[in-house]
Amino acid sequence: MSNQELKDNMHKSVEATQRNFATIRTGRANPSLLDRINVEYYGTETPLKSLATISTPDSQTIAIQPFDNGSMGLIEKAIATSDLGLTPNNDGKIIRINVPPLTEERRKEFCKLAARYAEEGKVALRNIRRDAIDKVKKLEKDAELSKDQSHDEQDGIQKLTDTFITEIEKYLAEKEADILKV
């Protein structure tokens, strides 16, 4: 695994963690809250964003305008049954969701969820590190690398891992501050 390949894989893990963070409510309306909502549409699980235009007319409202009015009830049901705790209001043309301010208890729950997503991201980074170090050790065993070269490579991999873990921790701190901000 080349150094660039290693960086790319680690960067993808950090991006996946950021996408997970984006799905956590912060008390303000944000279209990415609905990224994980799938709608049972003609017998197929379809992402909500491919069935409708999602916008935020103000900081407390999400507006959903389906491309096909026949899917309105399905979209409404998918949102209502999600774990987001949001209640959709259907006026026949647009589904509006009022995003209420978060309670203190809900804020703490979302902070725990963010911490869990961060830990999952760190575990993914550690798995990438383990695979890379295993490859370096194999090269050393096959006498393609000296002990010193192997040690230097492993140190470089560890430093890279530490850098990306610090990045995830920074994003976690930002997300927690965002969630706890009233």
Swiss-Prot record:
The keyword Protein biosynthesis applies. Disulfide bonds: none annotated. Keywords: Cytoplasm, Protein biosynthesis. One of its GO terms (biological process) is translational termination. Its main location: cytoplasm. One of its GO terms (cellular component) is cytoplasm. InterPro entries: Ribosome_recyc_fac (IPR002661), Ribosome_recyc_fac_dom (IPR023584), RRF_sf (IPR036191). One of its GO terms (molecular function) is ribosomal large subunit binding. Responsible for the release of ribosomes from messenger RNA at the termination of protein biosynthesis. May increase the efficiency of translation by recycling ribosomes from one round of translation to another. HAMAP family: RRF. This is Ribosome-recycling factor. It comes from Prochlorococcus marinus (strain MIT 9313). The lineage of its organism: Bacteria, Bacillati, Cyanobacteriota, Cyanophyceae, Synechococcales.
